[in-house]
Each structure stands twice: as structure tokens, then as C-alpha cells.
């Protein structure tokens, strides 16, 4: 929970000099923010009247630090002052502060990497069109010519072809009447003019092969069914998308089919010297050849092949999954099947029909060559041969040096799983074209729950502890910044929705409760409080852990109201201690349920794998589980002590067992953060008071230790560089040295705890000492038995732990209300100091702005830990 120092590049307004000279401490900005908000809130409260300034200052500090110690009864101030306290408390919560930091970081990323972010937006827009769902409507016409697209028909998916409707059959019969006596070859020549370069020397002529393949003996081997075309040569096109642009309208319908295969008997050979006599020069055939810059054309590139029987021309690729066929006969040719199919009788029937003089409107068939079922995925996974080796230290994202690592490749040129495009109409080609590089190798990351595969980066990056990326070139850092920017955008949306959802849910639930519960509603109205305002104030105070209540006895009046205690417990946990756990759980759910776009999934998974690069309160998996176990044990221990140590207590025994259990659960949740009470703490067992005092002091420890343990720059401030859990290939550390890592890690944690104690104890007891001096006379007086050393120590620890519990004083909500002015000033100082004890000892990577100085720090830390020289490369090395 912090707002640390930040820096930008040298040209920014907040440059490195400002960070090093003015913001020389990591909590400088946080202190300035909280102190400024406290002073501003106190001025507003004091200006509204009915308050002394010292009380206004104490109320403001309690609101901005989420302490909640009340110097006055809130029912004695105006609603405007109550609203001011509530708003300043909401704006100062850890969630809001870190949300503001995320927005601030987004601004600087946008400023420094504007071109990279713009390209990412264009790529996301492009990807949306290329990978859109198949159920979106396709173009219905090219000019005035109808289009019909049938994907994955016939034998490839082992599904029968959908029968034609009555309207389609009537249309086919009408076409047969008009075109029955026309010549097939003349009709073929008039339909679509072939590109000029097919007949010229603009592209090298390659031998053509059979146009249609089928699987007969082996699924992995295919053979040609039609004879070669002699001198008619077709150009080889590698990994391209060919789009046919037809500029004029035609009256003949155009149908697009994807047949599985064709029988050999249905093909005839076009004469070698055949040349169409009628050409429509308005029809242009354009080839859009999309090739990657850094990829080379293989000599084994797929070729375009043609085969004709006088009625059809087939353009296919030997390695491609698609072929384009000109069809002038019955459309049922799309349903032809190989010999081992269940539809052999359909193939025989259609073969006989092909020799008849039944001619219908011209049609274009886009036919994929048969591919075995186990080879149909466009991306194949290859197990890493070295993935089983347990390496130590910084790992590489190419799957070669990672434990449980695998890699998958997208290879649009040479592999059997490619999806290269053949000649397509313009409206279809723009949906299928792809801007992927010729070969991309990505990392396949495994988690304990399941295996998910998403691309990270297009280069091999060295990653150390706490997601620190080392030895990156400027170009590679820009690519990394683009992914980080997208992850920050997603995180911002998650935080806003999370924050608003629980506020609205709490408000609606408490409104329903307070207007339907007769006893509880009467308690609120008897205190002169509006029910609707009570619901809004209480729900927000619970989720934001303010600890303020409009009732003078906190929530003691609702001791037997189950619903507000259950909902209040949930809001307290999710608004503070369990927030990091819930945030990671939400991201985990989104990864498995959302399917927006590949870029969205990539950024979301990057946020899941490298949380501490983006957000202070988002931790890796292991740290999150440790935090969950610690919080569970602490809450169970507090609940156990309340139930056991209060046995025989006259005050607690009066509470029925069922309500007592619910009171123990709620009080346990409020003791470590919120500061609400449902029982009178001054009447419970002394041992339970000591337990609560201990819980208030260590309230910040679980999250603070998680932050510091996962901070990249923490080791720099401590001078202790913990070894990586997994070292890279260059470290050459054997497995025997792994035993030495455990003591180092224990020393690392123990050093944190010792520094935290030295940070807390002297300040805490100094404040306690000053208050005992100021309140000495009252401590000695027998007329005020509630003024005791233990009560003051309880109040001091409650203020320093920003909890807000108090043993009370007669009719006042807290003992602080009876302190003198100097003692109240000490309490303000304790609250502000305690608000920052969750800060790390050094700048946090999650709040640092991108700058060359911060990049140099990462390289320096890498060299200190591994004893390596700077390995920055001049140019990025594309993976292959």
C-alpha cells in the first residue's frame, strides 16, 4: 500500500534528478499525499463549524489513514461533514491510491512508447477481423453476384453436406434451362478472366501437379487425381493470400464451396493450346502477396496447380489447405469423398452426372486439400527435449532452460499444419490474411492448475527473480512495454469494476436490510439518523475499512443482527486483507472464461505471470498462497481465543451461542483492519484484549512482507541478493548448491522483520511515553478508573496499526476523545506513521515509470547476483 517515488526519461518533467534529490525516500510521495489530504480534510471539516480544529484534524487523519478513532460522536456533526469524512476516506484507501498509480503509469507509458502502443491498437483491430467468430455473417454478394460459403463440409469433418432448399433447387433448374445448350469452354472463358501473369513471364513457371488430393492408404500421404496440364504452368505462391477483385456486376450466381476431395473420373484435361476467346478486361485479378520481411522463400514452396475437365479449373497448393476450383457442373461436386469415406455412392452418382450436358451457373469452389484429422490444428506443440531438466536461476522464454517448459511454433510455410490462403474474393481474403512472421517461437508456461499456452514475446528474454527482465535491447524493451501497457489497461478496468461493484452491492444490501428489519431500523431512527444515509455510510465504511460509525456504540446495537455482520465480514476482508488474493483469483477466472482476442488473452496472462511489474498489491502464485494461509491461520487463532478465553465471562455468557459465534467471526475480521465492534471490549477477558492488541500490531505484516519479498529493488536497499529459484544456463550451478538458497532466503525474510521492528518500536514507544507524560495526572487519579496504562497502550497500538479499536470511556466512542491536545497530536502522528509501515525499503518496480536509469538498475542487480557482465545486445535476435 504505497505511493512511491517515480521517474521518467530524461526529457520528462519529473526527471531523474528530481527522484534522486527530492524524492530520496520511497515513502516521500506517500507521506506528502496523506499529510496533504489530512490537512485539506481538516480545513473543510473545521470550516463547516461545530468542531475544534484539533478534533477536525484527528477526524481527518482517521479518515485518510483508515484508522477510525472518533474524538466526537459523528451524530453531533452535520451530514456535509460526515460526507467529507467518507469521501476523503474513499480517496485514500490502498485500492484507490494504487488505482491512481496505475492510471499515472499508463499516462507515462503512453507518452514514452506512443508508437508502440499505436501499433498494438492497430494489431488488435486487425486481429479482431482476422479471428472473428465463424458465426458472423459473411458478405452476401460480390457486385450483383451471389456468394455462398460452406466451410468444413463433407469427409474432412465426417459430416454430410447440407441439402439444398427448395428455392435453391428451383434456381438451379431455371439456370439449367437457360444454359443447357451453351458450350462449356466458352462459358468457362466468360466467367472469370484469368490473370495475365498466368500466361506471361511476370512470374517463373513451375511444373503443375494434380489439383485435388485425397487420403487413401495413409492419412499423412496424398496423391494427385488429375493429370498434369502440360505447358500450362502456374506460379508458386508461398504463405500468401490471393484476392480476386471483380469490379463489374454479373448476373450469374457465384457459389463458394469447400469440398473434401474429387474422384479422378470427374476430371478431364483442357487442351494445352486452349485460350479463351472472350475476355472481360474490366475484371481484374489482383494478387496480394503477404510475406514477412525476415523470412526467406523456400525452394519447396507450394505451387498452384490446375486441373480441368472442360468444366472446371482447380488452383491448389501442394502444402496448402485450400484450393480454388472453377465449376460449371452440378454443385454436388462439393460433396465428393475419398474412397474410404461413407459417401462413396454419392461420388459415383456425381461422376455419372458430370458427363451429362446439364450446365448451371458458374461457380467458384474454394477447396481445402484433405488433411488427416490429427494434423488439422494450425498450431502444433512440440515437447522440449530439455524441458525435463531442472535448471536453476533466471530462465529463458524459449522453453529451452525452463523447468516444465515447452514451446509451440506457428510456421505458415513448411509445416503440415499451415493455413495458407489461395485465390479468394476480396471480401473473404481480408478476413483470412495474416501479418504473422514466417516463424514465431513462443514459450509454453505450465501452472499447477492447468496448462495454458499464450505468446509472450517474439524474442528470448532472460527473466530473474520477481519478473525482472535483463539484457534487453531498446527494441525489445519497447515490445515488452507494449505488453505491459495492455496489461495495465486491463488491470485498470478490473480495479474500477471491483471497487464499484462491492460499493454498490453493499449499499443495496444494507438499504434492503435497514428498511425491512424492524428492530435494527428502530435503533437507527431512535438515534436521529436517516436509514438510507446510514446504509450508504456504513457499507462504504466497512469496505474501505474506515472504522467510523454513525452510532455512538459502533455496531454493538446490532449484536443480534446476523445479516449486517455476515455482509460486513465479507466487505472488510475483500476491501483490505484479502484484496490481493481476490484480485489474483479474478484474473485467474478471466483467463479461463474470456475469449475476446489473442492480444487480450496475452496481456491478461502476462499480468497473471508477472504481477509485480504492474501492481503493488498483486503477487505471484506462491506468495499469494502463503498470504492466504497466513491470514487464515491468524483469523482462526483470533476466533479460537475469543471463544475459549471468554468462557465463564459473565458479559459474553449472556450472548446466545449462535450469536456469539457470529460476533466472534465479525469481531475477528474487524480487529485486524476495520475497527468496528459488536461487543464491549472493556468487558471481555483480559487475555482476549492482549490477543487483539497483538493482532492490531501485526495487521500490516502479512501484506507488507509479501510486498517486500516480491520487490525487485528490495535487495539493493538491504544489500542481500537472494539467489534465484531457477538459474539460467549460464550460471552453471549444480544441484548441490541449491541447499544454500534456503538459509539465504530465511536471512532475507528475517532481515525484513528485524528492520520492520526497528522501524516500529522506537516510534511506537516514543509516542506512548509522551502520552503517559501528558496524561500522568489522570493516570494517578482514582476518579477515572478507565484511564490506565494498558488502556492507553491499547489506544496507541490501535492508532499506529490504523485499526481504530478502543476500550472506550464512559459515553465517548473512544478513549482518544478524552486526551489533551498534545496527546491528540501524538495520535495523529502515530496514525500517519503507521499508514506507511507497509512500504518497501526501496522503490517498488510496480510504481516506477519507464526510464533509462531504472533499466540500468535492473542490469546492475543482475550483474551483482550472477557476476555477469552486461549482456545487452545491439539488435534483437528473432526467434526461429
Swiss-Prot record:
<keyword id="KW-0472">Membrane</keyword>
<feature type="glycosylation site" description="N-linked (GlcNAc...) asparagine">
    <location>
        <position position="460"/>
    </location>
</feature>
<feature type="compositionally biased region" description="Basic and acidic residues">
    <location>
        <begin position="165"/>
        <end position="177"/>
    </location>
</feature>
<dbReference type="GO" id="GO:0140107">
    <property type="term" value="F:high-affinity potassium ion transmembrane transporter activity"/>
</dbReference>
<feature type="glycosylation site" description="N-linked (GlcNAc...) asparagine">
    <location>
        <position position="293"/>
    </location>
</feature>
<comment type="similarity">
    <text>Belongs to the TrkH potassium transport family.</text>
</comment>
<feature type="region of interest" description="Disordered">
    <location>
        <begin position="289"/>
        <end position="344"/>
    </location>
</feature>
<dbReference type="GO" id="GO:0071473">
    <property type="term" value="P:cellular response to cation stress"/>
</dbReference>
<feature type="compositionally biased region" description="Low complexity">
    <location>
        <begin position="316"/>
        <end position="325"/>
    </location>
</feature>
<dbReference type="InterPro" id="IPR015958">
    <property type="entry name" value="Trk1_fungi"/>
</dbReference>
<dbReference type="Pfam" id="PF02386">
    <property type="entry name" value="TrkH"/>
</dbReference>
<dbReference type="GO" id="GO:0042391">
    <property type="term" value="P:regulation of membrane potential"/>
</dbReference>
<feature type="transmembrane region" description="Helical">
    <location>
        <begin position="28"/>
        <end position="48"/>
    </location>
</feature>
<keyword id="KW-0633">Potassium transport</keyword>
<feature type="glycosylation site" description="N-linked (GlcNAc...) asparagine">
    <location>
        <position position="294"/>
    </location>
</feature>
<feature type="transmembrane region" description="Helical">
    <location>
        <begin position="84"/>
        <end position="104"/>
    </location>
</feature>
<feature type="compositionally biased region" description="Polar residues">
    <location>
        <begin position="289"/>
        <end position="315"/>
    </location>
</feature>
<keyword id="KW-0813">Transport</keyword>
<dbReference type="InterPro" id="IPR004773">
    <property type="entry name" value="K/Na_transp_Trk1/HKT1"/>
</dbReference>
<dbReference type="GO" id="GO:1990573">
    <property type="term" value="P:potassium ion import across plasma membrane"/>
</dbReference>
<feature type="transmembrane region" description="Helical">
    <location>
        <begin position="625"/>
        <end position="645"/>
    </location>
</feature>
<dbReference type="InterPro" id="IPR051143">
    <property type="entry name" value="TrkH_K-transport"/>
</dbReference>
<feature type="transmembrane region" description="Helical">
    <location>
        <begin position="684"/>
        <end position="704"/>
    </location>
</feature>
<feature type="glycosylation site" description="N-linked (GlcNAc...) asparagine">
    <location>
        <position position="443"/>
    </location>
</feature>
<feature type="transmembrane region" description="Helical">
    <location>
        <begin position="571"/>
        <end position="591"/>
    </location>
</feature>
<feature type="transmembrane region" description="Helical">
    <location>
        <begin position="494"/>
        <end position="514"/>
    </location>
</feature>
<keyword id="KW-0812">Transmembrane</keyword>
<feature type="transmembrane region" description="Helical">
    <location>
        <begin position="787"/>
        <end position="807"/>
    </location>
</feature>
<keyword id="KW-0325">Glycoprotein</keyword>
<feature type="glycosylation site" description="N-linked (GlcNAc...) asparagine">
    <location>
        <position position="239"/>
    </location>
</feature>
<keyword id="KW-0630">Potassium</keyword>
<feature type="region of interest" description="Disordered">
    <location>
        <begin position="857"/>
        <end position="880"/>
    </location>
</feature>
<comment type="function">
    <text>Together with TRK1, defines the major, high-affinity potassium influx transport system. Involved in maintenance of the proper sodium/potassium ratio in the cell and in regulating the plasma membrane potential.</text>
</comment>
<dbReference type="GO" id="GO:0030007">
    <property type="term" value="P:intracellular potassium ion homeostasis"/>
</dbReference>
<feature type="transmembrane region" description="Helical">
    <location>
        <begin position="756"/>
        <end position="776"/>
    </location>
</feature>
<keyword id="KW-1003">Cell membrane</keyword>
<keyword id="KW-1133">Transmembrane helix</keyword>
<protein>
    <recommendedName>
        <fullName>Potassium transport protein 2</fullName>
    </recommendedName>
</protein>
<feature type="glycosylation site" description="N-linked (GlcNAc...) asparagine">
    <location>
        <position position="283"/>
    </location>
</feature>
<keyword id="KW-0406">Ion transport</keyword>
<feature type="glycosylation site" description="N-linked (GlcNAc...) asparagine">
    <location>
        <position position="9"/>
    </location>
</feature>
<dbReference type="InterPro" id="IPR003445">
    <property type="entry name" value="Cat_transpt"/>
</dbReference>
